[in-house]
Amino acid sequence: MTEDQKEKFAQEKQRLLQNNSLILATVNAEGQPLASSTPFVTKGEDFYICISNKLSPHTQNLLACATANILLVEDESLCRNNFARARMNLNVEAQTVSRDDEVYLEVIDLMQAKHGATVELLKGMADFIMFKLVPAESRLVLGFGQAFAFEAGKDNEATHITE
């Protein structure tokens, strides 16, 4: 990547990480896909979500198959061309986070700061589960001819996809 591409890559990645929600793609035990939207926060390279155990099919899917994909996409109202919207896809492995784990309280505080009072309500609901989504290989698309492959924590090694 050129220095200009590296700078644009870093700026656009950070901009997408400011989104309030992500698209979560999971599969059930029969391999049927499901896409849904959920609020998130990040801590380091990892993403954290809180979803209902009983009401959300994607919760059951993550418990049955920990491999998933998340999508962060540029707001339609901010892009000039919907075919060239900035977007970042990340393949992730989901891990449950116990309420007894010290990171649970840290992440709940981050969620409350980002998403407001609803998080306080969720904390008291026993059926809500926190998942840590650990990224593996990822792709950032910034427009036509501007796709980059990278791995978590290795942004400096991002590769411009030309074929």
Segments predicted by a language model, with ranges:
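An N-terminal domain-cap segment
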Residues: M1-L63
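General beta-strand recognition
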Residues: Y48-I49, N69, R139
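Short, structured beta-strand-loop surface elements
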Residues: P57-A113, P135
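Catalytic micro-motifs at enzyme active sites that drive phosphoryl/nucleotidyl and oxygen chemistry
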Residues: T26-V27, T38, T59, S77-N81, ...
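Surface loops and adjacent helix of pleckstrin homology
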Residues: N53, V73, G143-G145
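C-terminal edge-of-domain segments
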Residues: K6-F9, L110, T118-E163
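Short connector loops at helix/strand junctions that flank enzyme active sites
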Residues: N19, A35, K43-E45, L63-T67, ...
